[in-house]
């Protein structure tokens, strides 16, 4: 079932055909544990104080979680409970799994937000004129290759991890443990700048498991109950390569296997390597941190342009300076898939979107405690989030 050792890399593709790979990780991956804890802390503050200013980083290793960062808030938050509840939900509830919410040590090193930042960003300002919390550049991407306007590679990689979590929680595959990684390689055809998925070339799944399961049993279950339940049959063929549990053994996982840190899965969180990334992570940050809010807004713009039929594929870049409300620049790249010029599309964006942080927070309702849900399986391509509801454009 597993492919050859060399990975069967195919260099004989036709003109206009290429392969692209994206990966995702499950809830129990150590970096994702940290993302979820950071966003659980953010949500806990926003539930009591929608104006809380939060920048919360998390580190985890065997038997230990460290919270560090800067928070200014009226909320009274029990950090021990927030951390332990999050780990329990993820599924690390027994030391036999390498991590246990009941016995892990929780260290807290949180301070107030710097007054230098506060005075230039939000103090004595109308909400609409709140300044960006830092400088930076952010990207939004959309493509018509899927209904979600997301790359098929990352959509499937997320769904494979989510399916394993469902099978674990339901008890259908009781040998599964929370840490997992997936990777999907799709063969694409170029179509005048747009991309069309043709077939799946390779699927990789590595998932933590208990001791009393054989490798063959795991591989069979992953193919029959995970892949076939998630991946449309039209993309699979006799040449699709499967690397299922390629290490052969993955009993030690989660924070015991690797240290975790918030913000180390920024490509998993966004477009799986498609488009571009400005480098800023999302989790643990309130809306004044444009790393997060402006990336959500840029995705909203990109998806709205594609759904309006103005282009088939688009990359939107925005940039900011600390304390300045208006974006410094907005750029549109359509890969040649639009009947309009990029200047005309920029006019459409200016007429329909206000990308000041204080307006983004209102339009996308970013003071609500919705963030822990975003912290696994991707921030984009999921209809429950406001930035995934395309705006009806006037043009």
From Swiss-Prot:
Changing residue 264 to C: In MATD; has virtually no enzymatic activity. GO terms for molecular function: ATP binding; identical protein binding; metal ion binding; methionine adenosyltransferase activity. Its EC number is 2.5.1.6. Gene3D superfamilies: 3.30.300.10. Belongs to the AdoMet synthase family. The modification S-nitrosocysteine is found at residue 120. It comes from Homo sapiens. Pathway: Amino-acid biosynthesis; S-adenosyl-L-methionine biosynthesis; S-adenosyl-L-methionine from L-methionine: step 1/1. InterPro entries: ADOMET_SYNTHASE_CS, S-AdoMet_synt_C, S-AdoMet_synt_central, S-AdoMet_synt_N, S-AdoMet_synthetase, S-AdoMet_synthetase_sfam. Changing residue 322 to M: In MATD; diminishes but do not completely abolishes enzyme activity; 46% of the level of the wild-type enzyme. L-methionine binds at residues 70, 113, 258, 289. NCBIfam families: metK. Disulfide bonds join 34-60. GO terms for cellular component: cytosol; methionine adenosyltransferase complex. This is S-adenosylmethionine synthase isoform type-1. GO terms for biological process: methionine catabolic process; one-carbon metabolic process; protein homotetramerization; S-adenosylmethionine biosynthetic process. Binds 2 magnesium ions per subunit. The magnesium ions interact primarily with the substrate. The gene is MAT1A. Homotetramer (MAT-I); dimer of dimers. Homodimer (MAT-III). It catalyses: L-methionine + ATP + H2O = S-adenosyl-L-methionine + phosphate + diphosphate. Catalyzes the formation of S-adenosylmethionine from methionine and ATP. The reaction comprises two steps that are both catalyzed by the same enzyme: formation of S-adenosylmethionine (AdoMet) and triphosphate, and subsequent hydrolysis of the triphosphate. It is linked to Methionine adenosyltransferase deficiency: An inborn error of metabolism resulting in isolated hypermethioninemia. Most patients have no clinical abnormalities, although some neurologic symptoms may be present in rare cases with severe loss of methionine adenosyltransferase activity. Mg(2+) binds at residue 23. Keywords: ATP-binding, Disease variant, Disulfide bond, Magnesium, Metal-binding, Nucleotide-binding, One-carbon metabolism, Potassium, S-nitrosylation, Transferase. S-nitrosylation of Cys-120 inactivates the enzyme. An intrachain disulfide bond can be formed. The protein structure shows that the relevant Cys residues are in a position that would permit formation of a disulfide bond.
């Amino acid at each position: 079932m597993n492919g050859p050792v060399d990975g069967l890399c195919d260099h004989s593709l036709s003109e206009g055909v290429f392969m692209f790979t994206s990966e995702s990780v499950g809830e129990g991956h150590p970096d994702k544990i940290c993302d979820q804890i950071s966003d659980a802390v953010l949500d806990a503050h926003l539930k009591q104080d929608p104006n809380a200013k939060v920048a919360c980083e998390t580190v985890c290793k065997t038997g230990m979680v460290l919270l560090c960062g800067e928070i200014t808030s009226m909320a009274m938050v029990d950090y021990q409970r927030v951390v332990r509840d999050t780990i329990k939900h993820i599924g690390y509830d027994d030391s036999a799994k390498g991590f246990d919410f009941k016995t892990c040590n929780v260290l807290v090193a949180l301070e107030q937000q710097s007054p230098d930042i506060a005075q230039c960003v939000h103090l004595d300002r109308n909400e609409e004129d709140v300044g960006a919390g830092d400088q930076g550049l952010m990207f939004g991407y959309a493509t018509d290759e899927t209904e979600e306007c997301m790359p098929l590679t990352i959509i499937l990689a997320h769904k494979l991890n989510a399916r394993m979590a469902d099978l674990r929680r339901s008890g259908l595959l009781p040998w599964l443990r929370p840490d997992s990684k997936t990777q999907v390689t799709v063969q694409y055809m170029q179509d005048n700048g747009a991309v069309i998925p043709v077939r799946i070339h390779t699927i990789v799944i590595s998932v933590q498991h208990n001791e009393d399961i054989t490798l063959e049993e795991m591989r069979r279950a992953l193919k029959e109950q995970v892949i076939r339940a998630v991946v449309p049959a039209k993309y699979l063929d006799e040449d699709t390569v499967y690397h299922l549990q390629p290490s052969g053994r993955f009993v030690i996982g989660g924070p015991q296997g690797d240290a975790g840190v918030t913000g180390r899965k920024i490509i998993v969180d966004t477009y799986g390597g498609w488009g571009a990334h400005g480098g800023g992570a999302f989790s643990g940050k309130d809306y004044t941190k444009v790393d997060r809010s402006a990336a959500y807004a840029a995705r909203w713009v990109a998806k709205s342009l594609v759904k309006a039929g103005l282009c088939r594929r688009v990359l939107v870049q925005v940039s900011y300076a600390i304390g300045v409300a208006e974006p410094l620049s907005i750029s549109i790249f359509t890969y040649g898939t639009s009947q309009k010029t990029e200047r005309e599309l920029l006019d459409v964006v200016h007429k329909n979107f206000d990308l000041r942080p204080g307006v983004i927070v209102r339009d996308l309702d970013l003071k609500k405690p919705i963030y822990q849900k975003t912290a696994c399986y991707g921030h984009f391509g999921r209809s429950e989030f406001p930035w995934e509801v395309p705006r009806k454009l006037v043009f």
